[in-house]
């Protein structure tokens, strides 16, 4: 099929994108990048995919823009049938490949699952997702089951210093200056 090599499972896998439908008859695929700048997905190599429970390394042969899409060519994937077998595969790398961040900057993956508490000590819940709004990122927080305000989900802007007072990845807590009733 393709030039995919069996690989060991990554220690700390992170999904950078997903392979979409095939494009053309020569094995090209659409790719959906989850990186902030879509083209940054190509800065992280090698890519890993998981097929039938097995980790495999896939080698990028080339890529280009096509209309609004990015399409890729993988080594050894030379026809539409081979490309179709990779549709919906997540593109994964080990997080050790990501660059170190400056103090006060965080990868979204590191914030997922953190408990969010107010400066007064009220537990708002757990971060389950992040959203990009253009002006700032937003924490999507699943409220605790017995939330005193009957809220199921909260959206809290990730404004460092203004709303976000402290992030402690060791204890997996984020302290915020936020009204729990909002």
Curated annotation (Swiss-Prot):
One BP term from GO: ribosomal small subunit biogenesis
Keywords tagged on the record: Chaperone, Cytoplasm, Ribosome biogenesis, rRNA processing
Entry GO MF terms: ribosome binding
Cysteine pairs bridged by disulfides in the record: none
Pfam families: PRC_RimM, RimM
Subunit structure: Binds ribosomal protein uS19.
Annotated domain remarks: The PRC barrel domain binds ribosomal protein uS19.
Role noted for this protein: An accessory protein needed during the final step in the assembly of 30S ribosomal subunit, possibly for assembly of the head region. Essential for efficient processing of 16S rRNA. May be needed both before and after RbfA during the maturation of 16S rRNA. It has affinity for free ribosomal 30S subunits but not for 70S ribosomes.
HAMAP family: Ribosome_mat_RimM
Name of the molecule in the record: Ribosome maturation factor RimM
Organism in which the protein naturally occurs: Klebsiella pneumoniae (strain 342)
Organism taxonomic ancestry: Bacteria, Pseudomonadati, Pseudomonadota, Gammaproteobacteria, Enterobacterales
Gene name tied to this protein: rimM
